[in-house]
Amino acid sequence: MRFWDSSAIVPLLVREPSSPRSKALLREDPVVLAWWAAEVECSSALARLERDQSLSRKAAVSAYQRLAVFRDAWNEVQPTAGLKEIATRLLRVHVLRAADALQLAAAILAAEGRPSTVGFVCFDE
């Protein structure tokens, strides 16, 4: 089981340099955890690619369809008071943006407080 960041999900939806790595990781372990806003983050990335004309309208429609199918298959970590508490604590200890703290908190929550038990797939630089 791995927790997937949108930066690793988007390459499963459209061809990117990191697509082969994302696909290999998914084949190795098809159980996907994602936070409740992952779909919105992925949609934002797809919309940006379409606006920048890196993705045709037809390719974008297909990518959104793949996202819907993938979303239905992943395990989603919902926002809770506990998640908010962990995210707030992370912000006091680490230099993070709010959204990054929320996502990291979701991964920690999914790992039931034992982060080493769940892999984190992220291609952000």
What are the roles of these predicted feature ranges?
Residues 1-39, 49-62:
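Short, well-structured N-terminal submotif of metal-dependent ribonuclease cores
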Residues 25-27, 69-71, 113-115:
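Short glycine-enriched loop/turn motifs at secondary-structure junctions
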Residues 73-125:
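Active-site neighborhoods of divalent-metal-dependent phosphate/nucleic-acid chemistry enzymes
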Residues 37-92:
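Active-site-proximal, substrate-binding regions of enzyme catalytic domains
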Residues 11, 44-51, 108-112:
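Short glycine/serine- and small hydrophobic-enriched flexible loop segments
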